[in-house]
């Protein structure tokens, strides 16, 4: 007998729980996965019995046909697997331990994401600042500072205080993790900080 319990309802409940826990990034991944799977199935209601090996393999092929990267495919599959395993643990559906064995759930590092030094220099220095609108000047200064301050995330740059600056050293706490960071400031970055510190 087929399981008439709705997978999409379980996913939506999980998404709300994640939001309640302020895990918005994970909630977004779950929502994106659910949207992609419902779009693939061609319906808004998805039942647990539709999560089978053949459907998952077809979903994987569908995602690749849409030019999604293997890492995105893997994220969707791992999210489906996580939700499925949670439903099994809660006795909402019966489990098949090999259900996701034939779809890709790994991580590929084959795409170069870093820029070469020449490319960074071109982005940050090619057009003189005086030829740019005010908002683009500010954006380029921030990008330049983030690069020179060891790849500082924008959120950390935005939350810096003047008291974090002591001489040529920045001492601050990471916004995301709370970890203490100490960064020596190169002279070119120091010049930008002095110029735009307000």
Task: Indicate where each model-derived feature is located.
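Conserved hydrophobic/aromatic pocket- or pore-lining residues that grip, position, or stack substrates
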Residues: 56, 80, 123, 157
């Amino acid at each position: 007998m087929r399981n008439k319990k709705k997978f999409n309802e379980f996913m939506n409940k999980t998404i709300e729980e994640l939001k309640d826990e302020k895990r918005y990034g994970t909630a977004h991944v779950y929502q994106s996965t659910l949207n992609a799977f419902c779009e693939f199935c061609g319906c808004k209601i998805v039942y647990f019995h539709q999560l089978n090996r053949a459907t998952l393999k077809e979903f994987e092929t569908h995602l690749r046909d849409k030019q999604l990267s293997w890492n995105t495919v893997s994220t969707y599959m791992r999210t489906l697997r996580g939700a499925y395993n949670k439903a099994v643990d809660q006795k909402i559906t019966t489990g098949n331990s090999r259900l996701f064995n034939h779809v890709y759930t790994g991580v590929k590092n084959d795409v170069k994401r870093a820029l070469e030094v020449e490319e960074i220099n071109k982005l940050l220095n090619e057009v003189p600042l005086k030829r740019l609108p005010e908002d683009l000047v500010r954006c380029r200064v921030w990008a330049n500072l983030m690069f020179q301050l060891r790849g500082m995330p924008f959120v950390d740059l935005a939350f810096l205080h003047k008291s974090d600056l002591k001489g040529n050293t920045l001492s601050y706490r990471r916004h995301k993790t709370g970890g203490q960071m100490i960064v020596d400031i190169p002279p070119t970055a120091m010049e930008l900080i002095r110029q735009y510190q307000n």
